[in-house]
């Protein structure tokens, strides 16, 4: 297990649940000074990050890259994997694939959180979960070329109405077939809202949990 801390590069998310906001160089320097093993980076998009510069900063500060978030896909670009518009869903998938291609060569995974979207309007719950499952399966397979899993994060009820608990996440992943290359992110903020017992929820997540947010 390695400890990590977050660096957000997304101005539209300023004030959100991230620690460092003043660029990669500042974030990596401060993460190393605090003794963390790794950083999580949340960029506006893959093109906003110079992979060579990021690798050099990680090497300079003896850090690893734990994950790269895709949240700006929704926050900045209004893309989800469950949109009623098939072209929007494809654009969402393409955005995530670019993040995977940024993170994967550095040994890191992409995180799917807010880009999972919600059901409503012309898309009922079953259809939305079908879209989400298809996307996770395809993107997990895409990530396999980099020998990293895709990370999927259940969110609280105020951010999605699809998967809000560890049990929901397990059910979704179990429906993806054998060895889908997708793991769960157990985020204690969301879990504190949705779970009746954190310990039981973590046990329910079990082998599916591959990443934790405190």
What does each model-identified segment do?
Residues 28, 184-186:
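Short, compositionally biased strand/turn segments
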Residues 50, 163, 197-200:
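Alpha-helical transmembrane segments and their juxtamembrane interfaces
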Residues 9-11, 43-45, 71-72, 116-118, ...:
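Active-site-proximal loop/turn and secondary-structure-junction residues that shape catalytic pockets
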Residues 22, 60, 79-183, 193-195:
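Active-site acidic/histidine proton-transfer and metal-coordination neighborhood
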Residues 40, 67-69, 111-112, 151, ...:
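Conserved beta-strand positions in the central sheet of alpha/beta enzyme cores
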Residues 55, 195-214:
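A short alpha/beta connector and helix-capping loop motif
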Residues 14-16, 193-196:
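A short, acidic/glycine-rich surface segment
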Residues 1-104, 137, 179, 207:
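N-terminal pre-domain/capping segments
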């Amino acid at each position: 297990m390695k400890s990590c801390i977050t660096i957000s590069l997304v101005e539209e998310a300023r004030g959100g649940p991230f620690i460092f906001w003043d660029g990669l160089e500042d974030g990596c320097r401060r993460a190393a000074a605090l003794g963390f093993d790794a950083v999580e980076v949340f960029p506006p998009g893959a093109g906003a990050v110079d992979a060579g510069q990021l690798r050099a900063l990680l090497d300079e500060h003896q850090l690893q890259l734990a994950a790269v978030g895709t949240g700006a896909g929704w926050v900045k670009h209004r893309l989800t994997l469950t949109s009623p518009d098939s072209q929007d869903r494809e654009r969402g998938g393409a955005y995530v694939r670019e993040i995977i291609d940024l993170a994967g060569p550095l040994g890191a995974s992409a995180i799917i959180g807010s880009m999972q979207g919600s059901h409503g309007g012309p898309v009922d719950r079953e259809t939305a979960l079908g879209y989400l499952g298809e996307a996770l399966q395809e993107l997990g397979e895409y990530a396999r070329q980099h020998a990293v899993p895709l990370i999927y994060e259940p969110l609280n009820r105020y951010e999605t109405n699809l998967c809000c608990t560890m049990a929901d996440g397990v059910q979704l992943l179990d429906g993806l077939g054998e060895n889908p290359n997708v793991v769960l992110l157990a985020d204690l903020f969301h879990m504190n809202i949705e779970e009746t017992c954190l310990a039981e929820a973590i046990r329910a997540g079990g082998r599916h949990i591959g990443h934790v947010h405190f």
